[in-house]
Amino acid sequence: MDFTPTQEQAAAQELAARIFGDLATHERLSAAGTGSDPELWKALCGAGLVGAVQEVGLLGLVLLLEEQGRTTAQVPFAATCVYGLLAVSAHGSAEQRERLLPGITDGSVVVGGGFPAQGGVRASARGEPPAGHQQGVQAPHQQGVRAPRQQGVRDPHQQDVRPSTHAELTGTVPVVPWLRDATHVLVADADRNLWLVRAGDAEWQPVELTAPWAAGRLVLDGAEAEQLGGSDAYADVLATARTAFAGLQAGVCAGSLARAVAHTNTREQFGRPLATKQAVQLRAADAYMDTEAIRVTAYEAAWRRDTGLACTSHALTAAWWASEAGRRVVHTGQHLHGGAGADLDHPVHRHFLWGRQLDAYLGCGDELLQELGELIKEGEEVDAWDR
């Protein structure tokens, strides 16, 4: 295991830190409200950072997302790189790569994802409509994405229908982060096939989340979609998403802790800085250890994927740390600010909101542990990169 950044990864991280630091200021973030920052997105794409992910790999992306998390910059960087750039690069056909990748790298194509993790937002197939419902009609209180069976092609040697490369999807994805900015959305059906839908071919309504992620509710009613990859694509993209968003959480926690350290070093009580108090030191130390645990597990999962090793369980581990420990860290960051931490306009409150949102997005810690336990019980990882 060697997490030492390559020269290219270090250069990309340094450039990202400079751009995020210059443009994702407290004043600009406050002015943006719950929307994204188009000027910052243009700067990132113009600097070649989105396209650079193809060269620096998932570990490089984790490093870049750490810098985004430190500043809580409101751009669809993680979603576009995970559900767009890396997914299309790894699983798209030659025609899909040629058609989609140029737009993704220059920022004109923004991709959202409808299935981040177990226990979070996920699209699943419903199968055939229940009795009394017409084809393509969503039953009340049932959500998910269904790829109609007749859209497939029948294999004469098999009883089942294998999906064609195009289908019409019906269903609802309750929350898709950055949907308001997206030109495409990647969703999964119950058979874990991935489908790429043009946002303009679907209906959506804005949804406000804990963090300002420009989210929306995606409604698919016979929307045309193209399949991305084969049966192994779902597991890889899911593991990639868990790893990447864990890296984003590591940055959010690092930013929250850095603000808490600065505050407690300058704020005095009874003539002494708050940082000299033992209770403050212990809480800050615990938060630091939690942040490092998130970081190192995300690094390991990313490194394993980049080197072609099994990473499913490692991505789950990173997601668990990001969910459970991340929540502890952002609470600590707010608590160490005392009364100032309760101010909704204080910069540290933004880290608190992002940390809680990532906690929810990655999924409940108990469910992640259950999934990890089932994987360990099976005794092996089903991972396309080992084949």
State where each predicted segment sits.
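FAD-binding core of flavoproteins
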Residues: 102-258, 385-387
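Amphipathic alpha-helical segments in well-structured domains
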Residues: 58-62, 81, 97
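Signature of the chorismate-utilizing enzyme
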Residues: 55, 75-76
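Anion-binding (especially nucleotide phosphate/pyrophosphate-binding) glycine-rich loop
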Residues: 68, 73, 84
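Alpha-helical interface subdomain recognition
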Residues: 1-69, 107, 133-148, 152-157, ...
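Short secondary-structure capping/junction motifs at helix and strand boundaries
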Residues: 75, 94-101, 110-112
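N-terminal glycine-rich flavin-associated loop
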Residues: 76-94
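Amphipathic alpha-helical regulatory segments at dimerization interfaces
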Residues: 18, 22, 43, 90, ...
